[in-house]
């Protein structure tokens, strides 16, 4: 039995790359895993089928979606905030909507998810 056997894990941003590796590892260690995805439903469906985890579409830029996801996931033992975006180029030339989205995903989502958990 592993340290995460029968533990409940939520991974924000878990459908690809590092997030998918996190999901796979927690499942391998016996956890019940729910993960969110935003823009890659095919990858999310494949990962859920492969691992027996649960994929939920939720935009981390949407505060209400993040809060609902945490609430709907039930009592959590582990919260992993993997969702994040980056902007490239001159900071003074960035579109203000893109900067707002970056802050909603990278700063606000972790805050709201942590408070709700």
Residue ranges and their predicted role:
Residues 1-10:
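Flexible N-terminal pre-Rossmann segment of NAD(P)-dependent oxidoreductases
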Residues 90-91, 95-103:
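Substrate-binding pocket helix/loop in short-chain dehydrogenase/reductase
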Residues 83-88:
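Conserved NAD(P)H cofactor-binding loop of Rossmann-fold oxidoreductase domains
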Residues 15-16:
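Conserved glycine-rich cofactor-binding loop
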Residues 114-115:
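A short, exposed helix-loop element centered on a Lys and neighboring polar residues
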Residues 57-68, 96:
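The beta1-alpha1 cofactor-binding region of Rossmann-like NAD(H)/NADP(H)-dependent oxidoreductases
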Residues 31-45:
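Conserved glycine-rich Rossmann-like NAD(P)H-binding loop of the short-chain dehydrogenase/reductase
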